[in-house]
């Protein structure tokens, strides 16, 4: 679950329930601005104290350094938490996997840029080194911008009408008429642009992968239950709004 939801008090009851029923991981942001580092560190500390946190999904190496400081300040043992290297690490080869193991990671997420052949080779040759996970459903983030597209600024101003807090959905439309959803983060004034199509992959093709991951943004509970059923059955969604990513492309 993204860190920003641990900051917002209105989600506290939901997070409390989830932490009791499931293994709860804090998903750290790709961009952490220097002037927000202390604030986010404090938010992580509060989340660890308030909920049963199983581990963290890290977006880059700087996240690891940040967590080292946070856990030290809380007098907590790093080995009591699981660390997952997110797809943003762009792990392409066995050397990178071994390096992650040395850094203390417990699992790595396969890069969406890899094709099927490379994924199979990477997972099968590292089963004894580091566990792997594959995103089999979800819209892939294409870009993280250090800027708010809705407010047209790199920070929040008092006169901003805060479109980011509304329930509306916002998109960028390209010359082909495809809509790319944008989701702002009003904590740091960062915007994420998502792919116009949703990735959907057959899990049965990747028997050496340890974990299959589902990324949801604003899907309903019924949609999520349907997604879980499809993934568990080893199938994928079909239709023009879905894609199998780069599975059939050359790397």
Go through each PLM region and give its residues.
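Active-site pocket-lining/capping segments in soluble small-molecule metabolic enzymes
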Residues: 1-251
